[in-house]
Amino acid sequence: MDSPEAQALPVSELADRLDGWEEKTRAVFSGCVDDDLDAVMADTLERFPQSIQPYLDMIEGQRMDLTWTRYPRFDDLKLYCYRVAGTVGLMTQGVMGVDQAYTSAPWSDRPDTSDAAVALGIANQLTNILRDVGEDRGRGRIYLPLEDLQRFDYSEDDLMAGRLNQSWKDLMVFQLERAREWFDRSEAGVRWLSKDARWPVWTSLRLYRGILDAIERVDYDVFNHR
């Protein structure tokens, strides 16, 4: 929904496209294949069975971008982050697999990586939001929870004007701390992944955490730095 092509289209057409994606997704999960992309997806589902729900949740997240330009509470933003990013972790964890060391011992229970997978997606999306505050402002969007702006005495008008004051810095310190807490939640699950998947995921986690460090280095000026 963020591409230049998508932004040039009317909301009604974007909504129709998402309806089409939902219909196609349901069809593929039911075994109906119409094109090569469907065939690839069907083959993946056959080899790595999984629930359709994360895919439907992802589409719901895209629908939120058609109507939501503000998020009153963090709970609202967390739901959005789960839908557009946490779902990716649920989609891919079965493909990545779990290290046999955690499943072969007779006393071992197979670990559930779902919570960590969702946490990493939420952490990554929160990081994207913090990095892209200036860009989103230009599109009339504020993803930072309005309850947080109020808590730190920083208004929507302040954000739209790109005001860099102490209230903004205090607000951003709080936001970065929250994002890091979500990264912390995700780290425990990385060690459970299969050897081939562990390092790519760990590298991604470290790179995204590094974006938070970069925001600190520019003194939270995400209006003029990205």
Task: Name each model-derived stretch.
Residues 2-124, 130, 134-226:
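Catalytic cores of Mg2+-dependent Asp-rich isoprenoid enzymes
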